[in-house]
Amino acid sequence: MAAEADSWDADTFEVVEPVAKRLVPAGVAGDRWAGEDEEDDVKDNWDDEEEEEEVKEAEVKQEPKVSEKKKIAEKIKEKEKQQKKKQEELKKRLEAPEEHKELTPEEQLADKLRLKKLQEESDLELAKETFGVNNACGIDAMNPSSKDDFTEFGKLLKEKITQYEKSLHYASFLEALVRDVCISLEIDDLKKITNSLTVLCSEKQKQEKQSKAKKKKKGVVPGGGLKATMKDDLADYGGYDGEYVQEFEDFM
């Protein structure tokens, strides 16, 4: 019985390690800070990935610039090729002897100068195209947006149009032009323009009447002017009217 009791006690107080503890390798369970080191490594990896993505984005942004420069270079190269071809053609024309057989020395010189001028103009045109220079000037170069811009634009347009005011077709041209440019306006805007033209018409009528009145005052008096006035004065002497008047007329 005693032996059985000892065996019982031994079985009862045997310490059994938990299954989870036995599965954990030795030395790992005691390191409480190991997980934090792993998290730091993960964070470092994320930072590296973000930096790599930023570098890739920067490279992608730079690619269009490179391709754009390449396109510009190709365009310039193509223009130079065309210009070179034109210059060769001009050179052939300058050196062609058969073209000058029937020309006088003066005509040959004039032809050479003309071809030289064409070559210079061609070179200038190439330079303008290369650097993106716009040939537009004056009205064509304007793009009005503010009130001052439209005022300046109107001045230039007026100078351009009024140089043809002596033409017989000028009035009909303006009539059609005003109608066409006003066709898209609102009623209120059309009324303003109509009122402005009405006022202008009234002013022109007043000026015309004043001008006609001045011409009448400066005109010749009916009946002979000064001569008729002197004749009337002599007629006031009664009986001497016929004789003196006749002598006066003969004298005049």
Swiss-Prot record:
Composition bias, Basic and acidic residues: 57-107
Subunit structure, interactors included: Component of the eukaryotic translation initiation factor 3 (eIF-3) complex, which is composed of 13 subunits: EIF3A, EIF3B, EIF3C, EIF3D, EIF3E, EIF3F, EIF3G, EIF3H, EIF3I, EIF3J, EIF3K, EIF3L and EIF3M.
Species of provenance: Gallus gallus (Chicken)
Region Disordered, residue ranges: 24-107, 209-232
One term of GO molecular function: translation initiation factor activity
InterPro entries: eIF3-like_dom_sf, eIF3j
BP GO annotations: formation of cytoplasmic translation initiation complex
Localization, UniProt: Cytoplasm
Family: Belongs to the eIF-3 subunit J family.
Keywords: Coiled coil, Cytoplasm, Initiation factor, Protein biosynthesis
Known function: Component of the eukaryotic translation initiation factor 3 (eIF-3) complex, which is involved in protein synthesis of a specialized repertoire of mRNAs and, together with other initiation factors, stimulates binding of mRNA and methionyl-tRNAi to the 40S ribosome. The eIF-3 complex specifically targets and initiates translation of a subset of mRNAs involved in cell proliferation.
Coiled-coil residues: 65-130
GO CC terms in record: eukaryotic 43S preinitiation complex; eukaryotic 48S preinitiation complex; eukaryotic translation initiation factor 3 complex
Residue spans of biased composition, Acidic residues class: 36-56
UniProt name for this protein: Eukaryotic translation initiation factor 3 subunit J
